[in-house]
Regions:
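Conserved NAD(P)H cofactor-binding loop of Rossmann-fold oxidoreductase domains
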Residues: 84-89
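Substrate-binding pocket helix/loop in short-chain dehydrogenase/reductase
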Residues: 92-93, 100-105
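Active-site helix of classical SDR
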Residues: 116, 152
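SDR active-site lid
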Residues: 165, 169-230
Length: 257
């Protein structure tokens, strides 16, 4: 039996790196491909986990099909696609600018959609496979300064949930992950963009290793979604959107710009 091919974007990041460890621990025979733009961090992750590394700019959407074909020619079809790459800025919509905004949309929404579209035909043909999309709680509730990021994560989250419905009878599972703040470079960068205060200082923040373990557990069980830290599951249960908006307006940190 051919070992599974697992592809993880953002594989050099905090969450992606922990996910690599989970998959390597439980599937020592797997062919793991890590994708990231940070070549130095990617090389470290590759060597640590015995993986294959691919440096790729996911914002170059038109180049993705050619890169994908080259990858599967060299490494074989992808059995598990983990869309974990992401960037975040907390800046008002008027302060973001289109170029920065487009980059947020491309990395957080367009690229994972394109990669799903490229990966799914062979999964459907084999009636076997899994896609894991890392969305965000910022795509579930309005957070000041996150028009582009929250919009992109809302898009990939909903698209992922719909894809699960589309594919559940075709042997392909789709998991949607909704993290709140997680200790990572992304979280540190975002925190640096907001005014200091009780909200930014004490907002519940999770551990990447715990999130990765929960994602893997959901993968093994064929589950649908992960919400972590647990307190953010409450936001999913709030039925009154007006109440949610008022609460988020009060609790959202204030962007510097």
């Amino acid at each position: 039996m051919t070992p599974p091919h697992i592809l993880i974007t953002g594989g050099a990041g905090a969450i992606g790196g922990q996910l690599v460890g989970q998959f390597r621990q439980h599937h020592p025979e797997a062919r793991i491909t890590l994708v990231d733009l940070n070549a130095e961090a990617l090389a470290l992750a590759r060597d640590q986990h015995g993986a294959h590394a691919e440096t790729c700019d996911l914002t170059d959407i038109d180049a993705l099909p050619g890169w994908w074909q080259s990858l599967i020619d060299r490494r074989g079809p992808v059995d598990v696609l983990v869309n974990c790459a992401g960037i975040m800025d907390i800046i008002s919509i008027t302060g973001t600018g289109w170029e920065r905004g487009k980059r947020l949309l491309d990395i957080n929404f367009t690229a994972p959609m394109r990669l799903m579209e490229l990966a799914l035909p062979t999964m459907v043909e084999a009636r076997n496979g899994c896609v894991i999309n890392v969305a965000s709680m910022a795509g579930r509730v309005p957070i000041r300064g996150c028009s582009y990021y929250g919009g992109a994560k809302a898009g990939i989250g909903l698209a992922s949930e719909i894809a699960r419905l589309d594919l559940k009878k075709q042997g392909v599972n789709v998991i949607t992950v909704y993290p709140g703040p997680i200790h990572s470079g992304l979280e540190s960068h975002a925190r640096s963009q907001v005014k200091k205060g009780p909200v930014s200082r004490y907002i519940p923040t999770g551990k990447p290793e715990v999130l990765a373990e929960r994602i893997y557990r959901t993968f093994r069980k064929g589950g649908a979604r992960v919400i972590y830290p647990d307190i953010y599951a409450l936001a999913k249960q709030v039925a009154n959107l007006n109440l949610t908006n008022r609460a988020m307006d009060f609790f959202s940190p204030q962007p510097n710009q």
